[in-house]
Amino acid sequence: MAQAWAFLLLPALALASYASHLLLPAYITTPLCGGGDGARSFFLCAQAPKDQDQDPSPASTMYKTAFHFQPAKNWMNDPSGPMYFNGIYHEFYQYNLNGPIFGDIVWGHSVSTDLVNWIGLEPALVRDTPSDIDGCWTGSVTILPGGKPVIIYTGGNIDQHQTQNIAFPKNRSDPYLREWIKAANNPVLRPDEPGMNVIEFRDPTTGWIGPDGHWRMAVGGELNGYSAALLYKSEDFLNWTKVDHPPYSHNGSNMWECPDFFAALPGNNGGLDLSAAIPQGAKHALKMSVDSVDKYMIGVYDLQRDAFVPDNVVDDRRLWLRMDYGTFYASKSFFDSKKGRRIVWGWSGETDSPSDDLAKGWAGLHTIPRTIWLAADGKQLLQWPVEEIESLRTNEINHQGLELNKGDLFEIKEVDAFQADVEIDFELASIDEAEPFDPSWLLDPEKHCGEAGASVPGGIGPFGLVILASDNMDEHTEVYFRVYKSQEKYMVLMCSDLRRSSLRPGLEKPAYGGFFEFDLAKERKISLRTLIDRSAVESFGGGGRVCITSRVYPAVLANVGRAHIYAFNNGNAMVRVPQLSAWTMRKAQVNVEKGWSAI
């Protein structure tokens, strides 16, 4: 069991006397916690602090995000059917009209012109027919020929069996598409074939057109004990026939929720429209939500056999690729025809307690929408926040030419530490001190982040950011890298360690982490971007190779209203920072109940 580690500030006079010998004129580092030999390190092995005896009011609005998508109140979960249509972005989502806990699910609906500011509308779909009386659950939107959007969604029927249902906009001339009419022949799909699990049949994908001109879509399900994305065909999007075989299945995993299937060209950050012809050289991504995380495979879609063939067949699902290594689930992507890109959202649930959610009156949010594309080598997906989010940046702070030696902290001042966007490049002065990589770490990178935390010095790293830090450092979150040398390549571990993120009791405070390959022999810079939005933190490492979403609830946010951000290095090798930029993020207008009535 790994110990918890703490920052510990030296007294002010000790800091002043020690800082006088530092030879870094461009900035001042804050060295913390020294050994008897005079060497300084900002980490000190310590017992984990006790949780506060008195909870600092979890109902505080301080934990409500300023620029993430969430309703004004109550429970939300999966993104459902995001789309761009006639100049408007639509975000549908699983929503409980009646409270901040799961249940009574309908389709919430919001619209935007910029993916940043959102108008909340009345629910698009409610539970009012026999085929969805138990809930209007996750689904997708497909744009049919002639510019006709159609929703296909999972409904829970009166027997609590899961069915697939269709709805069309009542008035396509309404720019907001406020009202939707359910098809008379709903449900269009039932789990009534032999071997199908009637309560594990949900979350239809966006449709795509095959070489025969017929529509296809996939639905998450269980068939004869196998987890699969079940495949269906239709000529008119109303009458569907199950294809004999799923495009891909696996017998060693739990049911695949929220499947997503899309094409991408290696190295091209433009998206591909599934309703159009797929160009030569394109690959496909098959994503599934399983084991409480979103995983995916890259491969080739065999059009003749309607089969997905992964580039690498991996039986151990712990080694499957991950969309995000943190609190991120049920993601849904769509093709943005306005800018020719693919955008993905994920649901980030709360990691405080249900009683906290009841007190707050809200639970759940969606991650910042991300552009998603296939890396040039065709091996993995890359993600980056959409450029529109940068419109909220203000009060830019820049630093160049920093050098971080072992134990150095550099405070990033003059930005709001609770609402910030930080971009930093780390340049390795040497790669000779990289420690050997153990391939078994790939099975559980979170465990390795916990055992080799930021307080444990390494050869190269840990280096990164300390965010949401209280004055005395008894609360802080660490986002950082470690570099390892494999036989023929370098492996970078990215961690987001929440174990000391809050003194509040009853919280989940894990150490998240994931590995990515990096050609450090050619490129010595590793980038990190972290967006801090009160209780939501999203970090993107190595240009989007690893993404980690974290939910944090520091007491300092509710009690003090002041926190700090630092860049740090605790590795033996010196790390340069050629560029550091940070911004305060303004508050977006997101589903406010009053005060914003038009786009």
UniProtKB/Swiss-Prot annotation:
Its EC number is 3.2.1.153. InterPro entries: ConA-like_dom_sf, Fructan_Metab_Enzymes, Glyco_hydro_32, Glyco_hydro_32_C, Glyco_hydro_32_N, Glyco_hydro_beta-prop_sf. Disulfide bonds join 449-495. Keywords: Disulfide bond, Glycoprotein, Glycosidase, Hydrolase, Signal. GO terms for molecular function: fructan beta-(2,1)-fructosidase activity. It holds the Pfam family Glyco_hydro_32N. The active site is at 78. Glycans are attached at residues 171, 239, 251. Hydrolyzes inulin-type beta-(2,1)-fructans. May play a role as a beta-(2,1)-trimmer during graminan biosynthesis. This is Fructan 1-exohydrolase.
